[in-house]
Each structure stands twice: as C-alpha cells, then as structure tokens.
Amino acid sequence: MKKFEEFDLSIEVLQGIRKMGYQNPTKIQEQAIPLILQKQDVIGLAQTGTGKTLAFASGMLSNLTFNYDKIIKGVILSPTRELVIQIENEIKKIGVFTSLFFNFLDFFGM
C-alpha cells in the first residue's frame, strides 16, 4: 500500500490529510488520486466510508493549489443536500492549510 506522500499532492493538502489523522490511502484513493492529479475524469465506485471524498478532493485541491489564480476552477455536483454538507465539511478539513477560497451552494427543488 502506498503512502499519501508518494502522490504528487501539494504540501498544504498533505498537511490537511495528516491533521485528519489519515496515514495510508484506501484502494479507491490509490486508484483515483493519480488520475485526478493528471486532470483526468474519474468515475469511481466504492462503499460508504472508503474515502471517495478524500480521493477526489485531495487531487482537486492540490491541482488548484498549484495553479491558484482566484477564478472558479472546480465544481462538484451532488445529488442530495446532505451529501453537499458532508462534502463541504471534508473539503474544509482537507484544504485547511491552503489559501484557497471555498464557496458551497445548494440548490434543491424544481
């Protein structure tokens, strides 16, 4: 199993991951993070609690940290308000040491 330091994640994102208490990536993280860092689209399927949010967010935030210019660079869509809140909380933890600005919106109803 790899270590998070073996990925080309930004130092700030690695600090956030360490603060969260994670040592080793899960299988979905091992597979997804390198592709996301290469700015490839990824569709991943894994059970609840396996770290999918950390997988996509760590790569996305690292890419944004490396190329920060204060314009919108990332959009995450979620099917439920509850999942938006969960993703928001995780991204704030992962990105706590970055200088990135996060804005979360939820739109629901038709």
Task: List each model region and its residues.
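The conserved Walker
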Residues: A46-T50
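Walker A/P-loop NTP-binding motif
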Residues: E30-V42, T53-D69, I85, E90-I94
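Short, well-ordered helical secondary-structure segments
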Residues: Q15, N24, G51, L64-T65
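Conserved pre-motif I regulatory segment
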Residues: M1-L45
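Generic secondary-structure boundary/loop-capping signal
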Residues: M1-F4, G51, S58, T80
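Conserved nucleic-acid-binding Ia/Ib motif block in the N-terminal RecA-like helicase ATPase lobe
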Residues: E6, I11-Y22, D69-M110
